[in-house]
Amino acid sequence: MENRWQVMIVWQVDRMRINTWKSLVKYHMYVSKKANRWRYRHHYDSNHPKISSEVHIPLGDAELVVTTYWGLHTGEREWHLGQGVSIEWRLKKYRTQVDPGLADQLIHIYYFDCFSESAIRKALLGHRVSPRCEYQAGHTQVGSLQYLALTALIAPKKTKPPVPSVQKLVEDRWNKPQKTRGHRGSHTMSGQ
């Protein structure tokens, strides 16, 4: 029987960012209790030698699993010291990988207080609404005019420490795409 390869998307992340992610997850699991249903698996609980940790986040019947890896091949830069993160959505036997933005939205739907679009209707009907969102990473679109007016009326309160964001975990701070600048007379660089 021949070897069968399975390809996974692993986001290269520096070690300090992974440590920050782990400490934020543990803080919200054990201290603030906002993520008390989450499960943290240490490297010694896994039988895979490259897995550093796993965070299992229940989402109704499904769960989101954020796995951190170590000992991978180094990346293009010296700070990519073989560390990585994969994000997987599981429902019974079905598994698929998701991107960090979608992972943040899924976490946002199930956890943490939110001042969302439904707050507009509740406020108009005279109901009491939660004045702020604790998980700003879950909002990717620009809100409606009424939503923006309500959020401008009530200033967001910064939570310390912040809620763990998967998108912030895999964000690449150092490798921003560089803008191409040519010489003054170069038509090939400016596209003219």
From Swiss-Prot:
InterPro entries: Vif. It holds the Pfam family Vif. It is a peripheral membrane protein. It comes from Human immunodeficiency virus type 1 group M subtype K (isolate 97ZR-EQTB11). The lineage of its organism: Viruses, Riboviria, Pararnavirae, Artverviricota, Revtraviricetes. The record marks 150-151 as: Cleavage in virion (by viral protease). Counteracts the innate antiviral activity of host APOBEC3F and APOBEC3G by promoting their ubiquitination and degradation. Acts as a substrate recognition component of an E3 ubiquitin-protein ligase complex: mechanistically, Vif hijacks a host cullin-5-RING E3 ubiquitin-protein ligase complex (ECS complex) and the transcription coactivator CBFB/CBF-beta to form an active E3 ubiquitin-protein ligase complex that targets APOBEC3G and APOBEC3F for polyubiquitination, leading to their degradation by the proteasome. Zn(2+) binds at residues 108, 114, 133, 139. GO terms for biological process: viral life cycle. Residues 75-114 are annotated as: RNA-binding. GO terms for cellular component: host cell cytoplasm; host cell plasma membrane; membrane; virion component. A motif (BC-box-like motif) lies at residues 144-153. Residues 176-186 have a biased composition (Basic residues). Residues 40-44 are annotated as: Interaction with host APOBEC3G. Homomultimer; in vitro and presumably in vivo. Interacts with viral RNA and Pr55Gag precursor; these interactions mediate Vif incorporation into the virion. Interacts with the viral reverse transcriptase. Forms cullin-5-RING E3 ubiquitin-protein ligase complex (ECS complex) by interacting with host CUL5, RBX2, elongin BC complex (ELOB and ELOC) and CBFB/CBF-beta. Within the ECS complex, Vif interacts directly with host CUL5, ELOC and APOBEC (APOBEC3F and APOBEC3G) substrates. Residues 171-172 are annotated as: Membrane association. Residues 151-180 are annotated as: SOCS box-like. Residues 151-164 are annotated as: Multimerization. This is Virion infectivity factor. The BC-like-box motif mediates the interaction with elongin BC complex. Residues 161-192 are annotated as: Disordered. Residues 14-17, 74-79 are annotated as: Interaction with host APOBEC3F.
